[in-house]
Amino acid sequence: MDTFRKWLNKPKADDKSLLARFYHADRSLTAVASELDSFDGRAEPDRCTRLVSRLRQNQDKVLAITNMIMEELLGEDRDPRAFRAKFPEEVLQENLAGQLWFGAECLAAGSSILNRESESKEMRPLAQAVTKSLGHVRVLLRDQCLRNNVPNSKTLHLDFNDSNTEQLYESLKIFDHLFAEFELSYVSAMVQVKSRHEYEMQQWIGVLFSETLQRSLKVGLLDQDMVDAFDPGLMFSIPRLAIVAGLVVYAKGPLNMDMPGDQLSEMFRPFRTILIKIRDLLRNLSKQELYQLEKLLCTNEDINTKVPLGSSSIEAPSPEHNNSSSTTNTSNNNNNNTNNNNSSSGSDCTNNDKTGTTTNTHKPVERLVDHRNNNTTNSQQTSSCSVNAAATTPATSSRTRTPPSILSPSAGSTPTASPAPSPTPSHSIASTSSAATTSTNSPAHWSDYDDDDEDDDDDDVHADVEEDEDESGILDSDEHDLNDDSDSEVDEFFEAQLKAIVAAVDCAPGYLIPDCASGYLISNTNLGNLLQPQQVPLTDNFVASEDDELGNPTAVDQQQQPQQQLEHHQQQLQQQQHTEDEPSTSAAMLAARRTLQRLRLPSSSSDNEPSSNNQQMTIKSPSEQTTTRSSSNRHRHHSHHHHHHHHSHHHHHHQPTAAVAVAAAQDEQHNNNQPHSHSHSSSHHHHHNHQSHSHPHRANRSTRKRCSQEHCETITTTKTTSGGEQQTEDSLDSSTASSLSDDVSLAMRNTTARLKFKSTENLLHRLFVCIAGVADQLQTNFASDLRQILRSVFLMNMSSAQEDIDIPEKTKESELFEFRASENDVIQESAGSNQSIYSAEEVNPELDNVFNTNTGTNGARHSAGATMQRNNTIDLATVQSSNSGNSSSSNSSSSSSAARSHVARSRSLGDHDQASTSSSQQQQRELQLQLQQQQQQQAQMQQQLQRHRNNSVGSNSPSSASSTSSNSEHNSPVSTRSGSRRRLPSNTTTTLSTSIGTAATTPTGATTTGVTTTTTMSPPAWIPDGKAPRCMSCQTPFTVVRRRHHCRNCGGVFCGVCSNASAPLPKYGLTKAVRVCRECFMREVRQSHSHGQSQSQIHSPTQQAGGRPQAASAS
């Protein structure tokens, strides 16, 4: 019996109730599952694939209906799913439930997720519980479909007192809880779900993006209009700029590369290695170079580092350098030997000229890395002598207040002092600048670095020297002794670090290649992937690691010996090669030494141990210290002259003193016997240069030889010092050495990292490729997160919406008109009749002074009939007196003066309330306006009928004849009316007064004494455009092309087709034809015909008696 009842209650196929839909979906799913179990899927893979696809679709359908049933039955008792906020947008799809069911069945059957075996093992019991609970729910729902189904019911009609219903309720709650738990576990295993820390980091990244956008708007890289318009280009520009700002400007923010990798955001964690290398290169950029990079990231424009003087922190080429550069480009095509001699002479003159005029010399002294200025004369100077002399000159130069770039012995090879035979673009000055100024600054003090750059344009040489000495840590003192043993040991520690850097950069055998484009010598080992083609995919190793070039000193020494042996057998070839392409190791050493000195300054100043008067930055042996102290005092008076002409000695034959020559000769003899196995490549370069010297310059050669020997002994201090001094070195504070070692290594790595690039354009272009590559990968790998961040950034930084301006309602009738009549509109053929309400005074207000003229003179001209006054009204008394005065010519002046006395001027239709406040005059004026309105309506109807009659017959109407015969001086409405009244004979039957009287006694009009109607009605309010998306007649939707039109009669909104009619609306004061809809047009036309018929009946006897009154009045 129960089975029979269920068969009878089986839902129909067209039943739309929830239970019926579930019943049929469940039956279809069962059929597909049975078919899948009926054959071997490996034998028929195509059929199996189709059935699996159908199975997934049916599962989605069954779970969707089950979810709706749970929503209605459980309501608020459903298990919360707030964890879905952690899911990416790609996961939250409509078929997510079906995927979860399919995954639960696979896990319950023993399958595992690929590469997630451990997670699959943990989820397997939960998956089995989910499938078992879902099967039980399906059975109970099928039973309810056969018991309590109401066909086509929108709600469930279940008996809650039934035990089966309560069982279904509890089963649904259990299934909902298990399915929610399995959803979180399964999705977390398939995709990475963010933790609380990751959400906080993502919010900080959003703050970084917002700060970057505001900074870009302030600097001028972006426009506010682009933000308001949601420019798609900002989707790429903002992440790129945020990477630069996060690494440099806001270095303590979410892109702080000093924090552990696991604390970084998930978005930037895969790029941590490359971001660290980008940060190191960004810190070497000046303020202008950073701006050029950011501009390149925004606009992809060409890089332009040619900045005029004083515009940025990059020092522009001085006039002397521009002249020398032009000389260089000209002389480059000639013989190199001849140009070398001329270059040395030009260098001497330039140095003399630049003594008191060079500005901003702190950065040029760090830009001594220009390898292209090493001509034949400069190649004879060893790098060790350059470094040692560069370290000894600042103290001497401090007395004469001369910029360090002039006092340096390598000043002849600086870009601003010496013309070079190789082509030198003007932007190459900054391309080889050292990172000594910025590499040691902490990221938090980047703003201080920017502020310092703003003061680079001072024209005072002394102020620049003081600023440079303060920044570089050079003390301006001549009275202090040399550093004590502790400072010497600290310097020795720095020198050991410096030795490793120079050895790694300069002593690699056979790895120096000339770069023809820039004149640099770039090591092949330093190129790495930095100079690889742009088509190479972005990896973490596309920036060469600086650790590879540093190496250890032992490996460098092992590579040094075969190089020296090879160069010893090829002296002539090496001499020519060094003459043409020698790398400026001394410049790199000088830039590195300035960085070391800046690092050493806090430690030496803390012990109140000022630097010596000659500011030695290298460590000397004890025997050399006494000699240096005595020789510094002996050469103090002429050291400035020596440093200025260091490279011009060969041409001016400046001979040193005898004592210096003897000492130099002795040192030369001693150095010839000195083994060179412990010196680095710069000493070996000196060996070859020594053999290439000429005899007349032996004294200068000896001096340089002695200088080189001092530096050689400096590097090998530990081999030449005594046992007591060795113990002093061992007593160096280990904590200070370890703390300074990190700073020194960081500074040296940053300095050498920039030397790998042949120009500033190459550096900026490589940074652009790197930063753009990281930002573009964010667009691909983290598209959902990036969209959410950018959406928030746009909403936070877009301009505030303008407040709705409340337009006050128009109170004056004159402002309700759609347009103002011009003078041409007033004097048209139809405007001269009574239908025009636009006064000529509004068009030509200069005639207001008509009433201000003398009433005693020209009285006849200002009579009521002959005046040109505009917008004036005449009452009945005035008309009567005017008509009576026309009977005799003797009383013309008195009648005209009487008429003027009764003329009341009204300024405009909207200014009636500003007229006379007298009650009697106000009532009289209202009566006159009412009569005139009735007369205008009657005349308009008659004219319309006459116009229609003329159009159909083709004859000239009396009105047209009257209008054409009227004089041009009576074109205004008032003058036409008054003139016609004045010219009518007294015996005519159709006078204006009788017409007015007739109109006043007609049924359609109002009596003279009892008129209560208003002059004009206020136009209807227009329906706003926003409330009328469709035409109110044809219901056609409005588009950009199909515009809205308002009917002036009803205020409705219509399309152009439904409102193409036009008709005058006298009841609203609109006597000219205006736009009306078709319905209003038909209604107005019917009214016009009815009024025309009544008007023709009124005037028919008058026309019979008077013949053609209009023609008579015109005559």
Curated annotation (Swiss-Prot):
InterPro entries: FYVE_LST2 (IPR043269), LST-2 (IPR051118), Znf_FYVE (IPR000306), Znf_FYVE-rel (IPR017455), Znf_FYVE_PHD (IPR011011), Znf_RING/FYVE/PHD (IPR013083). It holds the Pfam family FYVE. Zn(2+) 1 binds at C1031, C1034, C1055, C1058. Residues 363-373 have a biased composition (Basic and acidic residues). The keyword Phosphoprotein applies. A zinc finger (FYVE-type) spans 1025-1085. Residues 322-361, 374-417, 425-444, 558-577, 600-614, 658-676, 714-726, 733-742, 881-901, 921-975, 988-1020, 1090-1100 have a biased composition (Low complexity). The modification Phosphoserine is found at S603, S604, S908. SUPFAM superfamilies: FYVE/PHD zinc finger (SSF57903). Residues 449-488 have a biased composition (Acidic residues). PROSITE patterns: ZF_FYVE (PS50178). Zn(2+) 2 binds at C1047, C1050, C1077, C1080. Keywords: Metal-binding, Phosphoprotein, Zinc, Zinc-finger. SMART domains: FYVE (SM00064). Belongs to the lst-2 family. Negative regulator of epidermal growth factor receptor (EGFR) signaling. This is Lateral signaling target protein 2 homolog. It comes from Drosophila grimshawi.
